[in-house]
């Protein structure tokens, strides 16, 4: 099935591993790391985990809450003052984390390459009106939540999400995960 997906389904490259009690039972990998099929996929290929990163970032947030550095009931602007711009002053941390902040997109067009310009993107978000009132409805923030929560973490700790990941999770748990 793994080989079939690589050959017939259009999957460019993939890997799959099963561990039990710290022992590798299955370790499959194949295909290519790029659509041009110039770089082979190997057992050490790092992949984008996309939405899975939300759970990892949530663990960082939970750790900050546990350390009394972040409070779900406080306003986001208590940590990130610029976030209060354009009618967002009363939005709580819990509202942001639960995709109820009305900040699920950008009001001005942005380019894919802008995603690599952290300060630019979070400034855009801080200086735009929300799409709806806080807690009015849940609307998934697929493209913006990483920037919004990431900037909140950065304001609380003075460190990037990636640095927090390394210090709070990777080091103590002896894991390998990268964000940023």
Where are the regions that the model predicts?
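Active/ligand-binding-proximal structured segments within catalytic/core domains
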Residues: 57
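Buried hydrophobic packing segments
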Residues: 60-64, 149-153
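Amphipathic alpha-helical interface segments
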Residues: 118-121, 142
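Cytochrome P450 catalytic-domain "roof"
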Residues: 128-135
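Cytochrome P450
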Residues: 135-144
């Amino acid at each position: 099935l793994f080989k079939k997906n690589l050959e017939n389904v259009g999957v460019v490259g993939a890997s799959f591993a099963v561990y039990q009690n710290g022992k590798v039972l299955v370790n499959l990998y194949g295909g290519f790391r790029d659509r041009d099929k110039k770089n082979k996929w190997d057992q050490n290929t790092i992949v984008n985990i996309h939405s899975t990163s939300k759970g990892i970032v949530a663990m960082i947030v939970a750790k900050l809450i546990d350390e009394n550095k972040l409070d779900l009931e406080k306003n986001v602007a208590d940590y990130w003052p610029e976030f209060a711009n354009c009618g967002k002053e009363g939005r709580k941390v819990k509202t942001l984390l639960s995709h109820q902040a009305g900040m699920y997109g950008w009001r001005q067009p942005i380019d894919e390459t802008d995603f690599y310009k952290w300060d630019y993107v979070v400034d855009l978000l801080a200086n735009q009106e929300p799409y709806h009132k806080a807690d009015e409805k849940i609307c998934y923030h697929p493209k913006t939540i990483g920037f919004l929560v990431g900037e909140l973490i950065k304001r609380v700790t003075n460190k990037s999400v990636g640095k927090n990941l390394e210090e709070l999770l990777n080091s103590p748990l002896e894991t390998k995960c990268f964000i940023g």
